[in-house]
Every structure is written in structure tokens, then in C-alpha cells.
Amino acid sequence: MIKIVNDQFTAVGAGTYTLKSTGALTIQFDLGDGEGYQTITDGVFTEAKTVLIALPSCDLKIISAGANKLTIA
């Protein structure tokens, strides 16, 4: 399990992940192709939430999270 906080990023390999937030936040990804971070479709959480999502190999980052955290498993 990986926990990230506001404006922190972590690299993930391609696969299916469970993402669990403790509250409102926005999840972004960067493929390393020079386009920079982009918001994941349905990656804007307005409350605590758990989702299952398939991701490519990328860097994940959360923004607009305040004190909220994201757990990746």
C-alpha cells in the first residue's frame, strides 16, 4: 500500500488498483510523454471514496486535497 498527500506523487506500474481517499481531492497522472499532469477521468472526489481503476505505467499525483490522503493498493 502507498499513501500520498497533497502535491505528492508516486510512480505506479501498469495494473488495476484500488484508490481510497479520506476526503475531497483530485487525482492526476503523468505518462512521462512531456504533456505533464492530467486529471484522471472521474478523478475528482468530493468526499471520501473508494474506486477500482486500471492505470498505465505512470506517475500519480493528488492536488486540492488539503489534509486528505489517497491510499493506493
Residues covered by each model-derived region:
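Acidic, Ser/Thr/Pro
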Residues: 1-73
